[in-house]
Amino acid sequence: LIASRGEVAGRIARTCRRLGVAVAGVHSSADADALHVREIGESIAIGGAAASDSYLRIDAVIDAAKATGAQAIHPGFGFLAENAAFARAVEAAGLIFIGPTPDVIERLGDKALAKQEADVAGVPIIPGSTTPSEDKAEVERIVRDTGLPVMLKAAAGGGGKGMRVVSTFDGLADDIESAMREAKNAFGSAGLIVEKLIPRGRHIEIQILGDGKGNVIHLFERECTLQRRHQKVIEEAPAANLPAALRDRMAADAVRLGKQLNYRGAGTVEFILQDDAYYFLEVNPRLQVEHPVTESITGLDIVELMLRIASGEGLPLTQAQIACHGHAVEARICAEDPANNFLPSTGDIVHVSFPAGDIRVETGVESGSVVTPYYDSMLAKLIAFAPTRDEALDKLRGAVDATSIFGVTTNQAFLSNLLNWPETRKATFHTRSIDESIGQLTAAPSESNREALALGACFWMMRQRKIAARDPWQSRDLTGWHMAAGDAGLSPIPELHLTTAGHSATIRFAPVQANGAMTVGINDDHVT
């Protein structure tokens, strides 16, 4: 049973089917007609649209597993993937949890406990506290002892939530109170830890795999430095300009930590790197969104490895058998408006098409899908692989520009700008680079020539009328143009969706006038 939704549910199902493993899924009321439900085939309705009424219901997910005769549950990512209580409930029901043991999930889910584990394993940790505190006075004392700038972190947090930068002692008490309140609301615990802020660092993470018996290997590193407000935007593998000796040290530390934990399944050890010094951040005890870039450079299927480990086969590879080839970059296409502070965009997807060819596309949407406010805004991931980093970046930017999505606003132009940004091309970025240059990266592109768009649309219409003469909506003698409505007399049929040079436009036509002129509507503008 796949206890997730969207692109990752479909991705896990494809690997299962390739291995001859039967699959079933779950869905909320909002996802009854979702792409992943049809891709999987057998799917159990587990509740209402809100995640708390469906995908986060441990009892409903386990009941679905029993109803389908499942032997194991793969949590995907998000929702219950890092929930120790869920993992325990799965095992208590006599099922296999495809992931780490509940005890390991619990230890890694608390940032303070995870930091203590890293310290015991001899992995460098960021200066600051190692135990959480809900005492405002104690947190303030730790901040002053550590020295500014610092990061306040919700000990029970994750995914970039419950984090607050403190760069001045002015208003410190208010900052602490706000961070505690946010942590309590988001995670049920107000406990904070304090860490020295690494202001211009790089986010490097190591993919590990363990058999749960002390044997752990790594699949090299990923660079996830390009973030907006602690949320990853572009990921790549391997990291650019990373000295081999430094890479080896980081990988060795990640493996050592995994062995100490008797880690089982796939996990990601995250570090913050500044110059040649690096520090432990956290361990994500699950499949990562960005796992495809690692699969691209190693030729391995991480989901397959997770399944084999869970079935008791152990690690099918030794470290010496794993090699890194080429370069891979991933971009997350999201339904959000960069021009409006990345406000999520919801609604019906009128049309979507992704580039064909040598581009890996992982998506949970199609034409006709509905983007609701209940879940994450990510629509798709595009992954480009090439012999060199420059080639991979070029290929990915071309794929982003070639993707057409109508009906909701997306971050495609922002991604295209980012992939062509000098700091990205030279790999001179740090984790605050996007936030410091957000105005430049979200600047609206120059407007396309409206007259050129109108002329191109007219040629398209004339051609359609010639090749579809038997269609009453398109023929020369009878077209849909008589269905004009509105001030400009624009017909609702046909409607042309056009993308060009990074711009998107919805085009409609008015009837041809007696003098041969015609008005063409381009979004909210009109050209005659």
Say what each PLM segment does.
Residues 1-269, 273-290:
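N-terminal beta-alpha lobe that positions the nucleotide/phosphoryl donor
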Residues 32, 525-528:
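Mobile cofactor-carrier "swinging-arm" domains
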Residues 216-217, 278, 516-518, 527:
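Hydrophobic residues embedded in beta-strands of well-ordered beta-sheets
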Residues 254, 292-515, 520-526:
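Catalytic cores of soluble metabolic enzymes centered on carboxylation/carboxyl-transfer
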